[in-house]
């Protein structure tokens, strides 16, 4: 079991501990539960889906990296496939506040970058901030997304974001988590190709500035993040953050990164290079390359 889970695990009910122990035994537990695993946990504990998700939130929050706030938020995004995806907030010493990741963004990106097609619900241990409510409104599940909070009745996103402004107001038809392929040729080594493939999946209907980041760890594992724009612009998630979300949730740490590649267009209206390289250097990665999409 990864050390970060030990304290939260010890506080779980005995029957949930017994059912989870073989799942969490792998140090690189992928911070997700398949539909089959969810069904097994429900049977072992007698909990329904909502109660089980609440019970698992401490494990999601244990994935948080919060050197600034020391305020850990956990989220579980429930995919329509039946898979549940953990998420947690992330803060980066030496970078800017704008580079931080919210738990809801983490869980949603985890699902999206894992190939999930849509979300049915999201469970969070604290009320989503306005930033996250706006981020969620970019999803193809839209204002119908169910939000579950401890001690409250579940409500749709529309109840948390009345009179919402979103992609439909800008006549955007392709939404976040819809399948997209921008068709750039995969060239270069494996890491470069991973970055280009991530750029091909970008959701960037507002700027038309595709980008993707791929991180290579010392053991050869590669994590890729795609750019995810938002109708309100500021809640946009950069591609580096997508890759860092996966790196963290899959049990790796910043010192494990040995090389990074950013893929973007040289003449795009928005350029990720400066922010990406500055944040990576703050995290200790200095081997950073840029591949131009063509």
From Swiss-Prot:
Question: Which cofactors does this gene product need?
Answer: Zn(2+)
Tell me one GO molecular function of this protein: identical protein binding
User: Where does the chain bind Zn(2+)?
Assistant: 102, 129, 132
EC numbers listed for it are 3.5.4.5
Q: Give the cofactor note.
A: Binds 1 zinc ion.
Q: Which SUPFAM superfamilies match?
A: Cytidine deaminase-like (SSF53927)
Q: What is this protein called?
A: Cytidine deaminase
What species was this sequence derived from?
Shigella dysenteriae serotype 1 (strain Sd197)
């Amino acid at each position: 079991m990864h050390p970060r889970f030990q304290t939260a695990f010890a506080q779980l009910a005995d029957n949930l501990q017994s059912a989870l122990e073989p799942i969490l035994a792998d140090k690189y537990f992928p911070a997700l539960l398949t539909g089959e695993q969810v069904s097994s946990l429900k049977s072992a504990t007698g909990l329904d889906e909502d109660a089980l998700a609440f019970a698992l939130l401490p494990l999601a929050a244990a994935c948080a990296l919060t050197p600034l706030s020391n305020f850990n938020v956990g989220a579980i995004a429930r995919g329509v496939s039946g898979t549940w995806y953990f998420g947690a907030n992330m803060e980066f010493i030496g970078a800017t506040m704008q580079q931080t990741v919210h738990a809801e963004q983490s869980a949603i990106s985890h699902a999206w970058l894992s190939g999930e097609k849509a979300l049915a619900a999201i469970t969070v241990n604290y009320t989503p901030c306005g930033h996250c409510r706006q981020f969620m409104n970019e999803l193809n599940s839209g204002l119908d997304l169910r939000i579950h909070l401890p001690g409250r009745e579940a409500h749709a996103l529309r109840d948390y974001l009345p009179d919402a402004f979103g992609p439909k107001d800008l006549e955007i038809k392709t939404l976040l988590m819809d399948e997209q392929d921008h068709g750039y040729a995969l060239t270069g080594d494996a890491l470069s190709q991973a970055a280009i493939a991530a750029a091909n999946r970008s959701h960037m209907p507002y700027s038309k500035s595709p980008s993707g980041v791929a991180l290579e760890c010392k053991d050869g594992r590669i994590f890729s993040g795609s750019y995810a724009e938002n109708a309100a612009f500021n809640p946009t998630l950069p591609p580096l953050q997508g890759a860092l979300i996966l790196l963290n949730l899959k049990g790796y740490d910043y010192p494990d990164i040995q090389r990074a590649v950013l893929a973007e267009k040289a003449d795009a209206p928005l350029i990720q290079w400066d922010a990406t390289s500055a944040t990576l250097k703050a995290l200790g990665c200095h081997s950073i390359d840029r591949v131009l999409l063509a």
